[in-house]
């Protein structure tokens, strides 16, 4: 019976999530993608004006953060942000943003991402902080605001570093390009290897003389 009930409850939970949080956030993404402020005031934008939208302006302000990862464009940046609401949102956001303009979604994405930057984008969003619901669960379990933010910061920092290494090393392999970013990536990888294989040291323990205690 549990083999039937377990999957059913999991699927039902996803259906409720898809029908509420994901649907609502997709509507918000669509609205902020096609509306913005222009010289004519606040209005709905044409396909070739999407970069002037509310979402476009937000993404453009933050896109520079992901330049070392190879996906420093506002569309990918916004998709990563909406992934904090629910990871499934990334698919819907990418579909909306890259369907604007000429060509298909896949053609527009192929023109924006290289193989290395595509894998870097996936690595970042797979390893970064989970959705808001999971963050809430982490905070409840830790029961400490300070350690909660440390955990979230660690996840985002690890995702950023791994994503950078994936892009820089991937670019070196596919194109042969070598730069400062490649050097940084190699140094980070060396640091990871050291942390994995460094000798384990016993922590200092307190020795108690049981005879004196007795």
Show which residues each predicted segment covers.
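Core transmembrane alpha-helical segments of multi-pass membrane transporters/permeases
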Residues: 3-34, 76
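Transmembrane helix-loop junctions at the membrane interface of multipass transporters and ion channels
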Residues: 136-141, 161-179
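Hydrophobic transmembrane alpha-helical segments of multi-pass transport and channel proteins
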Residues: 11-18, 89, 129, 156-165
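Alpha-helical transmembrane segments of integral membrane proteins
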Residues: 5, 21, 120, 146-154, ...
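Juxtamembrane inter-helical linkers in multi-pass membrane proteins
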Residues: 1-6, 51, 98-101, 213
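Extended, low-charge hydrophobic alpha-helical regions
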Residues: 27-156
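Membrane-interface capping segments at transmembrane-helix boundaries
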Residues: 195-211
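Hydrophobic core segments of alpha-helical transmembrane domains in multi-pass membrane transport
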Residues: 22-34, 121-125, 156-167, 186-199
């Amino acid at each position: 019976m549990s083999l039937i009930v377990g999957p059913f409850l999991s699927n039902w939970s996803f259906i409720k999530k898809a029908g509420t949080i994901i649907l609502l956030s997709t509507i918000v993404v669509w609205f902020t993608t096609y509306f913005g402020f222009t010289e004519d005031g606040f209005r709905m934008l044409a396909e070739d004006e999407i970069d002037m939208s509310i979402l476009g302006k937000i993404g453009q302000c933050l896109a520079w953060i992901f330049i070392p990862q190879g996906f420093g464009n506002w569309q990918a940046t916004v998709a990563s942000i909406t992934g904090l609401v629910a990871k499934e949102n990334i698919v819907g956001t990418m579909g909306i943003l890259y369907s604007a303009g000429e060509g298909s979604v896949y053609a527009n994405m192929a023109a924006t991402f290289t193989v290395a930057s595509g894998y870097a984008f996936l690595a970042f969003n797979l390893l970064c902080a989970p959705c808001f619901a999971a963050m809430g669960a982490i905070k409840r379990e830790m029961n400490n605001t300070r350690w909660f933010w440390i955990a979230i910061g660690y996840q985002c920092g690890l995702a950023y570093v791994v994503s950078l290494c994936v892009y820089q090393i991937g670019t070196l392999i596919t194109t042969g390009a070598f730069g400062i970013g490649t050097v940084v990536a190699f140094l980070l990888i060396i640091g990871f290897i050291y942390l994995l294989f460094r000798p384990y040291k016993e922590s200092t323990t307190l020795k108690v003389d049981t005879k004196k205690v007795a």
